[in-house]
Amino acid sequence: MKPVIALVGRPNVGKSTLFNRLTRSRDALVADLPGLTRDRHYGEGRMGERPFLVIDTGGFEPVAKEGIMHEMAKQTKQAVAEADVVIFIVDGRQGLTPHDKTITDFLRKSGRSVMLVVNKAEGMKYTMVTADFYELGLGDPYVISAAHGDGVSDLVEESLDIAFAQRPPEEEVPESKDRSIRLAIVGRPNVGKSTLVNTLLGEERVIAFDLPGTTRDSIEIPFEREGKLYTLIDTAGIRRRGKVFEAIEKFSVVKTLQSISEANVVLLLLDAQQDISEQDAHIAGFILESGRALVVGVNKWDGLTSDRRDEIKIDLERKLGFLSFAKTHFVSALKSSGIGPMMKSVDNAYAAAMSNLSTPKLTRALIEAVEHQQPRRKGSIRPKLRYAHQGGMNPPIVVIHGNALDAIDANYKRFLEKHFRETFSLVGTPLRIELRSGKNPFSRSEK
C-alpha cells in the first residue's frame, strides 16, 4: 500500500506549491470530486524507490458551519482521515495566527501523525522563523521553501519513514495468491461494484450499504472461478467485520488509486443508466497512466431501450475513446448476465500485459511496419528504425533503436503501437513505445 500524505493549512501558505513539487506538477490525477467549489486534489509522488500519494486540500476552517468554507472543511477532514501522515503548513513570513491554533486543535484530536512545516522561509534564520510556532506544541518545526525546493526532500523522507514505521508488518502472501490474477473493480459510487463482487464470489459475502468513516484498511479476497485463481483488491471500501465483508459505497479516491496500483487488471465499471461523467473519465485516465491492463464493464444493461443503448455506445466512443485498446462488455451484475465473457476478457488482458515478446519477433514486426509505412522526413533527415526489444511487462514496453528517432512524430508512434498490437494480439493492455537513438556518425562531436 502506498503511504498517503495530506497537506493541510490555512489559505495561501503554499500547499499547492508543495503539492506540485511533490507530484512534479502532475496535479489532480483523479480530479475534483463533483459538486464542490474547492475539492481536494490527489497526485502521486516518488522519493527514490518509494512511491506515495499526496492530497492537496483547500484552505481549512475547521469550525465553519455553512457555505463554501464548510464544504472545504469537510473535504480537508476527509483528507486527514485518509492520510497516514499530515503535513501541517504554516507561513514563516506571517508568523503564528489564531487560525493556525484552531487547525492545531483539530489535528491533535484526529489521532494522525502531524509534521509541522514552516514554509516561505527563504533567507531567514531557523531560530527566528520557528520561534512562534513552538507554542503549538507539535515539536520541532521543519523549515522549507516549497517554491525553491529547499528542505523538501528531507521533509518527504522523514514523512515516509513515519508512515512506514506505524504500519503493521505485511503478511506473507500465500503461494496460491502469487499465481492469481490481482483484480481491482473501480468506479463511481452506486454503479454496482458490490453487486458484481457478490456475483463473482458466488455467495452473499458482501453487504452493500453506506457507512460513515474512512476506507483506509486494505483487504484482499481470494476466489476461484472456472478453475482460475483471482485475488479481488478492495476498491469500493470492502471491509472485514468478523467473517463478513461489507462494501461501503462511499467513494474513496485514495482507495481507488491504491487499488489500481496494486492490481494486475482493473475492471472499470460504468452505469448504463447514467451518462459517462467527468469523474469516470478521470478514473479511466489514471488507469491508463498507471499502465494497468483494463476491461470496461457497462452495468445495468438489462431493461434499457434500444435508443438508450445506442446513446451509451456513442457516449463511450466520444468520452472514453482513448481506451480503445480495452474490451467493453455490457452486463447486468444483478442478473449475472454477461459476466462470463467479461471475466474471459480479464484473463486475456492479463495474458497480454504479461506477454513475453522476443527480440527477433519484435524486430521482424518493426521491419514490416517500416516497409508498410516509412516515417516522415524532418527537414533533410529521415529517421531510421533498426531493431526492437522488450523493455518490460505490465504494461509491455517495446524499445526501438535507430538513428534520428527524435524526429518521429506522435502519429507515426501511434501507427507503430497499432501495428505491434495487431501483430502480437495485445488486447486489453496499454502498450508503451520507447525510442532510443544511437549517435549519428556524421554529426559534429568534440574532439
From Swiss-Prot:
Keywords: GTP-binding, Nucleotide-binding, Repeat, Ribosome biogenesis. Residues 355-439 form the KH-like domain. GTP 1 binds at residues 9-16, 56-60, 119-122. One of its GO terms (biological process) is ribosome biogenesis. Residues 3-167, 181-354 form the EngA-type G domain. SUPFAM superfamilies: P-loop containing nucleoside triphosphate hydrolases. GTP 2 binds at residues 187-194, 234-238, 299-302. Pfam families: KH_dom-like, MMR_HSR1. GO terms for molecular function: ATP hydrolysis activity; GTP binding; ribosome binding. GTPase that plays an essential role in the late steps of ribosome biogenesis. Belongs to the TRAFAC class TrmE-Era-EngA-EngB-Septin-like GTPase superfamily. EngA (Der) GTPase family. HAMAP family: GTPase_Der. Associates with the 50S ribosomal subunit. This is GTPase Der. It comes from Herminiimonas arsenicoxydans. The gene is der.
